[in-house]
Design a protein with these regions (language model features):
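Carbohydrate transferase catalytic cores enriched for Leloir-type hexosyltransferases
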Residues: 1-625, 629-653, 658, 667-690, ...
């Protein structure tokens, strides 16, 4: 399971209280006992200092990358009614953020937060994809409404939190008493409330103080003789008044021997009130000691020094001070109610806290009987050893497992996908080229659309004059202008993206109307480059290049040839980031995304088989087709399909065929079904082909001619190098037609099952290719086996109906679970909040949503250039160093110079573009979007670095690094120093 611990209880007002201490101790124990599970922490970025201390506490237990922070609008304290809109917006933003982390279980350490601070804790009302667990400390305010809920604002806040708690899938009670309260008062099923108990920090243990240490301790806290001790806070239910009155009823000799020390923080009004009560009860001025706050170390020493610890509370969720005192070896007596008997574990150490006489009598029994005190000390140490944070954590994790198991079992009994209602199919805009456009994607769409229309009412969005496929005549057809005006009326939008000019118009449409992207070619650099002059988009390619690949790629393009840049860089990030979901047809495309944009970037992509139609049923018999094409019945025809170009390795096939036995068999022919690409490769290939009379090139092949050659072929060879992330439809067509096919394991072809083809190594040798040709040529049995296997594979996985159903599932899953769809739902839910809102609040909410987005891309090296770059006449060496950083950025990183302004850090784009000679791009110096894992790199002293980096960035997980700018920093040795700084 992925378990997320919401530890805001360790950040704000609860941080130094019992709840904060409990939450931290339990979370640390969970981290120690989470083997087999993935544990992550979620924190509130509004408290950056506490984030740093929590990161330090979990160092070595939880990877830094698994500690997340989120941002919400502030202020959000519910005590102020003016914060109502921000509170509700913040709860929605937090829930959305948590869902984006894909947890199985979220544990909220403390739900009753946020009354006067900016902690946001709630259990969403509906639509949870994960289980929520909440720690249940007690329900004392509900049980004692007259004391705690008299203020209407407090009551409204508390009851709202109760309703949220009741929605939780699991409550982790800190005692058996608290568990029973949850079951009875919240009317919850027993299986939803689990007692995990509590424990104390190992620092609470017996210690021996030297006489002078003891004397100094007592003197510092105003204690002058042996003492009776209480700690645990000043509150009505703590019953300190009853304790003072009970102490006053002790025999005079005991009061003269023992002071009463109340050890805890105390406000002046409470101090004056308790001192008046003591005087009224007849106590001398020094009988009662109100110490005020004491450190943990002094608290432990006081526990060890006290003659008796008394815990007279009227109600507790657990009673941690009593356990701490026992763990230190103090004799402990306490109330006989709620959870306190569980903690103390001894019936004769209990008293009725509502009876002053009972409290006093119990105290006197211990103080007058040393043997009784010794027995309580020994029993207390034994009892305290029964409580363990590791055991608490193990119980909690077991409860998580059981709760998650129930959800998983429920999921297995439901249908994963609900078919679209026959009454109304969703309306889908389909943006793609279609026949007669000479594009493989056009044919692909024509094949897919009839089956996809079983699931959607489809309308075609075209950038062509007409469609000549009769099967598509019933689909409504519109141009881009119509779509711009009517896109909002569609339920779904699908874009078929490829790397040709037929897709150039889609970039603007996608920017204006986001939708599902089917990425046929991972590299889109070709179409983007050609779109600049054809669609009047100046610098479109360079802007896309920078946004996808950074200044290094931009500098390369400036210094070299555009063609080399187009070949080197995919340039597709704008399309991918704007898509509401992405479908690809090979895992190779996913691997490319991970290579270029980070290991998690394509986590939500769907890999679907490429739709291919079965062999056409009206094909005449094979001998007749071969005769029509000019071949004899016993000829052996080897075909290769597609445009002839360098990446298709056609020249290597020609050479291998000429060197093989096939070239010497007059029955054998090699046919390239396609046209030769222009350029030097094409010229050389024509000369090579001309050297043998039985090597043919058809030129552009119509659909009918293409299918005829598929029907006629005895074997096929489809090779590839320098894949651009595309999937070869020709390979699949060959298999579908039962043509034994040779491929090399490059790109998507590596995913064709080995039993269905002859698969050479990616970097195959000429001998291997020649051997494969001769093996197929000489073994009709092998050809027959491969023919059957290939056709069976295609029928099972690539049929039109099967692919259309997978399309439907992918589109609907994206609409249901995809990040863009979830963000749109979040925005809609925020817009529906029924509370007064101001424009600054809306801006805060928008900024929070943007900041909370997952990074999932290349990491940034944020170079602070204020030290030198913004000063006129900066030294050329300094500019050279920055240029070297840009060009030598380690793999997986991009260098982004940044600068400060009055509000924070901005990207120094104008400066950097001028530096690399591309000032014409005129990109905006936008606010820096710092993400976890980024590095802030300052060139200068540690002092400047410490001042410069925003604390929120540190909290977010941005690493702070300094690179000394000295004479040793030269461009030629920079990369090693840069790598060292990133470690």
């Amino acid at each position: 399971m992925r378990i997320i611990l919401d530890l805001q209880a360790c950040q704000a007002s609860s941080m130094h209280r019992g709840i904060g201490r409990y939450s931290m101790a339990l979370a640390l124990a969970m981290a120690r006992n989470s083997a087999g599970h993935e544990l992550r922490l979620v924190l509130n970025e509004d408290y950056p200092d506490s984030v740093a201390s929590i990161r330090q506490a979990f160092d070595g237990l939880v990877p830094a990358s698994h500690i997340h922070t989120f941002v919400t609008p502030v202020p959000a304290g519910e005590v102020d009614a003016r914060n109502a809109w921000r509170v509700h917006a913040a709860e929605r933003i937090r829930a959305h953020y948590l869902a984006g982390l894909r947890p199985d279980v979220v544990h909220i350490a403390s739900l009753f937060e946020g009354l006067g601070d900016n902690v946001i804790a709630s259990v969403p009302a509906t639509g949870n994809s994960f289980d929520t667990a909440v720690t249940l400390y007690d329900l004392i305010p509900l049980m004692r409404k007259e004391r705690y809920l008299g203020d209407p604002n407090m009551a409204a806040w508390y009851y709202r939190k109760l309703e949220s708690m009741k929605r939780a899938d699991l409550l982790l009670a800190i005692s058996g008493s608290a568990r029973q309260e949850g079951i009875d008062l919240l009317q919850l099923p027993p299986e939803r409330v689990v007692n995990i108990s509590s424990a104390v920090d190992p620092i609470f243990r017996p210690r021996v103080l030297a006489p002078d240490e003891r004397a100094d301790l007592l003197a510092r806290h105003g204690v002058k003789r042996d003492f009776i001790m209480y700690t645990g806070g000043i509150d009505y239910r703590k019953n300190i008044e009853g304790l003072i009155e009970a102490y006053a009823k002790l025999p005079p000799q005991l009061r003269h021997q023992y002071q009463l020390a109340v050890v805890c923080s105390i406000r002046d009004p409470d101090r004056f009130r308790l001192e008046r009560l003591a005087a009224k009860s007849g106590l001398a001025k020094d009988d009662l000691v109100l110490t005020g706050y004491v450190s943990d170390d002094d608290l432990i020493s006081l526990y060890n020094c006290t003659a008796l610890f008394v815990f007279p509370s009227l109600h507790e969720g657990f009673g941690l001070p009593a356990l701490e005192a026992m763990a230190c070896g103090a004799p402990v007596i306490g109330s006989n109610n709620s959870s306190i008997p569980e903690v103390i574990g001894r019936a004769d150490a209990m008293f009725d806290p509502t009876s002053v006489d009972a409290i006093s009598a119990s105290m006197a029994q211990v103080l007058l009987d040393p043997a009784r005190g010794t027995a309580l000390r020994e029993q207390g140490l034994a009892q305290a050893s029964c409580f363990s944070w590791d055991v608490c954590a193990q119980r909690a994790i077991e409860a998580f497992e059981e709760t998650h198991g129930r959800r998983s079992a429920a999921k297995r009994t439901t249908v994963a996908f609900a078919p679209v209602s026959s009454e109304r199919k969703p309306r889908l805009a389909y943006v793609s080229p279609l026949p007669p456009v000479r594009s493989g994607i056009a044919g692909y769409s024509a094949d897919l659309l009839p089956a996809l229309s079983q699931h959607y009412d489809i309308e075609l969005i075209l950038a062509q004059d007409s469609v000549d496929d009769p099967a598509l005549g019933t689909f409504p057809q519109h141009d881009s202008a119509w779509f711009d005006a009517n896109a909002h009326t569609f339920d779904r939008i699908v874009y078929q993206f490829g790397n040709s000019a037929f897709h150039a118009h889609m970039f603007g449409l996608l920017e204006r109307h986001p939708g599902m992207v089917v990425l046929h070619d991972f590299y889109l650099s070709g179409v983007i480059s050609h779109a600049e002059p054809d669609h009047h988009l100046p610098n479109h390619y360079c802007r896309s290049l920078y946004l996808a690949h950074g200044y290094g790629a931009l500098a390369e393009e400036k210094q070299g040839e555009r063609a080399a840049s187009v070949m080197a860089y995919p340039c597709n990030k704008q399309v991918l980031d704007r898509a509401t979901g992405v479908i690809v047809h090979s895992h190779h495309a996913v691997d490319l995304a991970r290579h270029w944009y980070g290991p998690d970037y394509a986590a939500s992509w769907r890999v679907l088989p490429l739709v291919r139609l079965p062999p056409r049923t009206d094909t005449a018999d094979r001998a007749q087709v071969r005769a029509q094409l000019g071949f004899a019945a016993d000829d052996v025809i080897t075909c290769s399909f597609g445009i002839l170009s360098a990446p298709k390795c056609n020249d290597r096939l020609v050479k291998a065929w000429i060197d093989s036995a096939l070239a010497h068999d007059p029955r054998c022919h090699l046919v390239f079904v396609g046209e030769i690409a222009p350029g030097r490769f094409g010229i050389a290939l024509r000369d090579l082909i001309a050297s043998h009379p039985r090597i043919h090139v058809t030129g552009y092949a119509s659909t009918t001619q293409y299918q005829d050659y598929l029907a006629a072929a005895d074997m096929a060879v489809q090779l590839r190098a320098n894949s651009r992330g595309e999937t070869s439809g020709a390979v699949l067509d060959c298999l579908s037609y039962g043509v034994p096919t040779i491929v090399n394991a490059h790109g998507a072809a590596a995913e064709v099952p080995a039993h269905a083809c002859v698969r050479l190594d990616d970097a195959f040798t000429q001998d291997a290719l020649r051997g494969a040709l001769e093996a197929l040529h000489g073994d009709p049995v092998l050809r027959a086996r491969l023919s059957r296997a290939g056709a069976a594979y295609m029928q099972a996985t690539h049929s039109r109906e099967h692919c259309a159903a997978l399309y439907r599932d992918a589109i609907e899953a994206c609409m249901r679970d995809g990040a863009p769809a979830a963000e749109q739902a979040l925005i809609a839910s925020i817009a529906a909040i029924d509370a007064k809102v101001a424009d600054p609040d809306l801006l805060q909410a928008a900024a929070a949503i943007a900041t909370n987005r997952a990074c999932g891309s290349t990491r940034q090296i944020l170079v602070d250039i204020d030290a030198f770059a913004l000063v006129d006449g900066a030294a050329q060496r300094e500019r050279d160093v920055l240029m070297a950083m840009i060009s030598q950025a380690p793999e997986g990183w991009r260098v982004e110079p940044v600068r400060r302004d009055g509000t924070g850090y901005r990207y120094a784009r104008r400066y950097t573009l001028d530096l690399i000679g591309r000032a014409d791009l005129q990109l905006e110096d936008a606010v820096v979007d710092a993400k976890p894992g980024d590095v802030f790199l300052s060139l200068g002293s540690d002092t400047a670095r410490a001042i410069a980096i925003p604390p929120r960035w540190i909290a977010r997980g941005v690493q702070d690094r300094c690179l000394a700018f000295d004479g040793a920093m030269m461009p030629m040795n920079l990369k090693e120093r840069l790598l060292a700084a990133l470690v």
